[in-house]
Amino acid sequence: MERDKPVSVSEFLLLGLSRQPQQQHLLFVFFLSMYLATVLGNLLIILAISIDSRLHTPMYFFLSNMSFVDNCFSTTVPKMLANHILRTQTISFSGCLMQMYFISELADMDNFLLAVMAYDRFVAVCRPLHYTAKMIHQLCALLVTGSWVVANSNALLHTLLMARLSFCADNTIPHIFCDVTPLLKLSCSDTHLSEVMILTEAALVTITPFLCLLASYMHITCVVLRVPSTKGRWKAFSTCGSHLAVVLLFYGTIMSPYFRTSSSHSAQRDIAAAVRFTVVTPVMNPLIYSLRNKDIKGALVKVVAVKFFSVQ
């Protein structure tokens, strides 16, 4: 069969979401709007945290890092928009591997940061008298740096595994960006090792932080339920509300598509999950964290006021 003959593939075709011209125009406007909202929202949060000294705390340090990661996540959108404007669907082989590398790295970073933020909430709620002594700046910096190192190592491993594969004449990717699973489907090589590594990564890099996060919230729940007053319990839970909403949004998006082997994947389900993961989630996170947080809203007002009066 022709598929069994490896050829030198220099580029791939990203089919995107729709081939209908009218739908493409609507999707272009949608993605452009979401991208601008993501960049603006996350930049405002980063600026607000850096300007307002009251927000120079571990919780907001982790939040500013997550906003940075979310902004980086949305960089897959400009490629889609550029392809629409240029009337092309191509992406180079090296560009595809690079895109896959950054998506894997940033997804892992989001996962690690959510676990780190859960630990921060655990210390704040369950060990309030020791919070300042435990959550020192050096520890916070170490947790974030360690997360970047592990995420980078895992993404690099993924990329090297994909780079060693051979690809056939069929270079069409039914996706909005280069992801591991659709690339495995196109490969003419034996993908068993890559599939095993992906499942191992899912177990170690995804489930382990999730279990740490789950343990933190189990402790938080036990402590909060022992608070005698309803008002006290609500106040304690409210400190975790925004983070818990982001956790549910994140894991609700990634659990389904990334825990199946390549043979059981549906392109439509993968694309829908990818849109939620790389477009919807990054724009929702700043909204979730700012709508119910008086400190963030106050800092955002300060940022807007400073920028407005500086222009005047």
Curated annotation (Swiss-Prot):
Please give the InterPro entries that the UniProt record associates with this protein.
GPCR_Rhodpsn, GPCR_Rhodpsn_7TM, Olfact_rcpt
Which GO terms fall under biological process for this protein? signal transduction
Where found in the cell?
Answer: Cell membrane
State one Pfam family annotation: 7tm_4
Record keyword 4Fe-4S present: no
Disulfide bond positions: C96-C188
- Keyword field: Cell membrane, Disulfide bond, G-protein coupled receptor, Membrane, Olfaction, Receptor, Sensory transduction, Transducer, Transmembrane, Transmembrane helix
Tell me what topology the record assigns in the membrane.
Multi-pass membrane protein
Q: Which GO terms describe its molecular function?
A: G protein-coupled receptor activity; olfactory receptor activity
Name the GO cellular-component terms: plasma membrane
Extracellular side of membrane: 1-25, 79-99, 158-195, 259-271
TM segment ranges: 26-49, 58-78, 100-119, 139-157, 196-218, 236-258, 272-291
Topological domain (Cytoplasmic) residues are 50-57, 120-138, 219-235, 292-312
Similarity comment text for this entry: Belongs to the G-protein coupled receptor 1 family.
Q: What does this protein do?
A: Odorant receptor.
User: Any idea what this protein is called?
Assistant: Putative olfactory receptor 1F2
Which organism does this record belong to? Homo sapiens (Human)
